[in-house]
Amino acid sequence: MSIQAPPRLLELAGQSLLRDQALSISAMEELPRVLYLPLFMEAFSRRHFQTLTVMVQAWPFTCLPLGSLMKTLHLETLKALLEGLHMLLTQKDRPRRWKLQVLDLRDVDENFWARWPGAWALSCFPETTSKRQTAEDCPRMGEHQPLKVFIDICLKEIPQDECLRYLFQWVYQRRGLVHLCCSKLVNYLTPIKYLRKSLKIIYLNSIQELEIRNMSWPRLIRKLRCYLKEMKNLRKLVFSRCHHYTSDNELEGRLVAKFSSVFLRLEHLQLLKIKLITFFSGHLEQLIRCLQNPLENLELTYGYLLEEDMKCLSQYPSLGYLKHLNLSYVLLFRISLEPLGALLEKIAASLKTLILEGCQIHYSQLSAILPGLSRCSQLTTFYFGRNCMSIDALKDLLRHTSGLSKLSLETYPAPEESLNSLVRVNWEIFTPLRAELMCTLREVRQPKRIFIGPTPCPSCGSSPSEELELHLCC
């Protein structure tokens, strides 16, 4: 039989204050600092909105990490807190005890709410915010500096989530007093006019990750370019399934030139991902030459590129230190792979991930990339499935990986000799050929996680993943 621990005196004191909201409100200014967190959590869990409104006005810490306490925003709770902040921001003389500089609506730091009471006697909590956002990303702190509200935003639908809509309206009405800082912004299906409205409210210099999906490239470039130019702290930029409906190559070139000029301002960019790359076919160099910062991650996927596009990849210093290169499902079977081989040689000392899945590379092209690939000593992940390889070409490829001792996950296609007229695997032929390939590989090194053939495996259902220790079908 377990004995439940008696409530702490602090908990009892907080519960006593909350029984009479008028008493708790009048006591806020003189409330001991050590009581503030437990009392706030109690008021929050019981939804004592009036108490929350007053508590936020005398908040004794620099940050209120509400997002880690409220996983999903609750409209009435949000209104209560913002009402308290409104009353505070409109006062000429702010309370002596008030220290709040950041309202954080992200799920950042659960430890904040678990460390009371002792740790808070000396803490003013600047640490959590600095881990996710540096001081240069948002306006400088100081007396009567704008209050910063941090939130990660995902725009999925119209009408918008009512909490987000209320927050946008609240911030817009207090321009100059509040900055809405969004470190990560994702736009799924929201029409471009609503995305523009959001960008007019968000403090653009705070955005570190931006993902835009399912938009027209011409409209995106014309309507959003002016906003992208102001995102000077952008680290990750993703365009997914953005399409185009023009066959005018000259017009495309002008649009790409306008779009590329944006990158002259993005001095901190580390990741660039474009899914459906065809819009840039024949114009990729315009974009690459405008990159100011050496990228760590480049993903250009789905579609096709010309040989001139591939050549530019090895010619600019911004791509000289890549750690991750993904060209999956970019059709490469009609062009020379010598430029790709030159790029691999250039980035051999830094490259950790190489994804050439589904590029329809023919075994006659393979020799162009093998010297560069064999020098990628830091490579841990190599995806080469869904390419057109003979058994001899695959053996040659595997032998060239002998020096890749850090390789921990790799995929290869079934040799073409094992495919039937419908380009499906004939398992009677494939099984001994796969054993032959594994024997060739084990002669030069011991693999860790390897897939040869179709994925997911029809025999065991497994797919490439970091969790899979061994593909038993090999």
Curated annotation (Swiss-Prot):
Record bears the keyword Repeat: yes
Biological processes per GO annotation: negative regulation of apoptotic process; negative regulation of cell differentiation; negative regulation of DNA-templated transcription; positive regulation of cell population proliferation; proteasome-mediated ubiquitin-dependent protein catabolic process
LRR repeat residue intervals: 97-124, 179-203, 204-230, 231-265, 266-291, 292-323, 324-342, 348-375, 376-400
Keyword Ribonucleoprotein applies: no
Alphabetical keyword list: Leucine-rich repeat, Repeat
Highest taxon listed in the record's lineage: Eukaryota
GO CC annotation: Cul2-RING ubiquitin ligase complex; cytoplasm
GO molecular function, one term: ubiquitin-like ligase-substrate adaptor activity
Family named by the database record: Belongs to the PRAME family.
Name of the protein in its database record: PRAME family member 1
Organism the protein comes from: Homo sapiens
Annotated gene: PRAMEF1
